[in-house]
């Protein structure tokens, strides 16, 4: 019969793997996550008290949630969706609505990254239902902000701004005590980065005047990330570089882009590599500028490696 000690060890292993993912990207985490799943999935069929079983379902659901995110970051979309589906089933068994909301957020992000914006919005809406059942204001703010991002990518300017305002209000009203590991990344710095990403995409789809606000928000986010959030900082630098180029400040755009390239070196993330490609396209529009030309060429070299 298993006890709380086995569940606690699983929770601690998931926490350590999540920290590695934020710091180094999904690719370096794949083997560790797969090993952790092999070692801990048999616990689901072991005898346990009702209290231990409920907590075990949450812990394994969160490990599946992390496995889905790691696979997504590594470019393994089918594997990611499979893990997320298992996470939803286990979170449902445990009636863990806060975790269900987080899994829906991450599923939405998969579709958002791959350009399926309406599907992303559907998952963000499903997540809002779970967040509302649990009264989880932090999850609600995260989901509203990401729905704003999907709308910005679609060019739905009014909806993007309205949803971003709602997300900020929900974040401000949310309790920050006892935040679960799967949601702990959503700090003021991350909210600023998310708002910056919304404005950066609005600068592309709705008007370049959004670039200046994006620059301010992204700079705040980048300055606020600690060393453990290296991937988030790199993604912020990519968006910052793009926003500077759209605004016409080529020197600042090139500087931010080169910083992004330098910081991406130790990070194993297909998602980061994907996000560099639109930046290279923006840089190529300024081939007469030697720095922009160099930035595009260096991104191409990294992509080809």
Each predicted region: which residue ranges?
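Conserved binding/catalytic microenvironments
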Residues: 2-7, 11-305
